[in-house]
A protein has these predicted regions:
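Active-site-proximal loop and beta-strand segments within enzyme catalytic domains
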Residues: 1-131
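Short, intrinsically disordered, charge-balanced linker/junction segments flanking boundaries
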Residues: 1, 174-175
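P-loop NTPase catalytic cores that bind/hydrolyze ATP
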Residues: 134
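Hydrophobic "lid/gating" helix adjacent to the active-site nucleophile
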Residues: 163
Length: 175
């Protein structure tokens, strides 16, 4: 009866939800993310510099939905602490007050979070490398746009309730 956060184990749940929409014919895996989230059109790749003054170059191609699902989109997480892009993610992630430095959840709604992440350069061109990242958060935003529902409502209606996962939800006030 213990309630706890499942953190990154939400990634397969989000991926299943997105693939349900794929099965409905709402997108193709090769579709550019920018087709549904305009903020991701014409991505730029980091060359040099530091936040907020980056030198960039155009990415070799657009980010595909497949890239998001396979963590090959060029995105990152702030907690890697490897690059200047990680540092920029920490700035975006911590919010205006800097009060979310444990990376436990995006401080913004998914629409604004997606726009903030898209405003930053990619670490590499889509498809070039694998990097554990916020790609699943962007998949969550895609689910919202494609389904017309918030992510938590979609997961509840199409995953948790059909599987009788009555104690599973998006956020718990009990933690």
């Amino acid at each position: 009866d213990t309630i706890f956060r499942i953190y990154s184990m939400t990634k397969p749940i989000t991926s299943v939800a997105l693939m349900q929409l794929f099965e409905q014919g709402l997108f193709q895996l090769a579709d550019p993310v920018g087709k549904f989230l305009p903020e991701f059109k014409n991505p730029k790749v980091f060359v040099s510099g530091s936040y907020p003054h980056f030198m960039t170059r155009p990415a070799d191609r657009e980010i595909s939905i497949r890239d998001l699902l396979t963590h090959t989109a060029g995105l990152t997480y702030g907690f890697h602490y490897r690059t200047n892009i990680d540092h920029a993610y920490r700035k975006v992630w911590s919010g205006p007050r800097g009060d979310n430095t444990d990376f436990s959840f995006p401080p913004l709604d998914l629409e604004n979070f997606s726009q903030s992440i898209a405003s930053l350069p990619l670490e590499f061109s889509p498809g070039d490398k694998w990097n554990y990242s916020v790609a699943t958060d962007i998949c969550g935003r895609l689910i919202e746009v494609l389904s017309g529902m918030t992510l938590d409502d979609y997961l509840s209606k199409h995953i948790f309730k059909p599987l009788k996962m009555k104690d599973t939800g998006f956020l718990s006030q009990k933690i």
